[in-house]
């Protein structure tokens, strides 16, 4: 299946449901498809991004060195561990907990940033926690010029190429 995500008549992204969920092309798509932590970052080099004051390995490449980017991390892709865990990338304090039926939704304050985290394990409000974000949980997007806006050239070119391919298939 192929999905086209549009905003006010403009194509934002074309792709499979999995591609759109896992690799949103802009802030609008990331918010449209589900809850996300969207953070400002700097792409240091291929496979390395800096956000929240530290460098994280990631699986993205093809960005310019030191390019400002938007970093998307889904709430279910963040692991909370003991604050003493030496593998923790970040440390924070649980500000609130909301039971959502199949999981808990936590708001965790990490310095000046509040992360939304989903987990099936309960942690009490006020608890200090460690945060682990693995490379494949980090999704990098080109920085939007304006909030929730994208240069539509890429999406339009993709749609045009798909339509041309369909016409060629019909001609053969």
Task: Walk through the language-model features, giving the residues of each.
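Conserved catalytic segment of ABC-fold P-loop ATPases
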Residues: 1-5, 16, 22
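Residues located in well-ordered beta-strands
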Residues: 16, 28, 42, 91-93
